[in-house]
Amino acid sequence: MIVFKKQSILSQLSEDGNLMSKAIKLQSKAAEYGFDWPAVELVFDKLQEEISELKQEVVLSNLESSVDRDYYQERLQDELGDVLFCCMNLARFLKVDPSKALNSTNDKFERRFNFIESFVAQQGKKIEDLSLTELDKAWDQAKEQGL
């Protein structure tokens, strides 16, 4: 039988409302007590494992059309949470601020999508008139231009 301590080591962490920060704080605190991966390669392995588990839940949720959707939504949420938590651990290992990384990627996505919109408008079309393949080609052009 497992007996829980009244006061967890993790309960000492302050709440700042930032979920990415909380994940990193939880992992950092656990690491102080030896609960950590010894190398970043193992974090990548764990991330691949978590992605595989998420993929498995996606397949199961699509196969079981007649059963409780709430159950599968909860499973998908749980597995996606594991992937995100692992990504925060990777950010900690790489010493990268995940908020800054995500903000940078959001900005990059906006620049590239704006390029696609301009590209499509120059052809006198609407974005929904192009296939995904055509949109991907425009995306690749945006990348080539350093956007």
Which positions does each model-derived feature cover?
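Flexible "arm" and connector segments at domain edges
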Residues: 1-80, 85-147
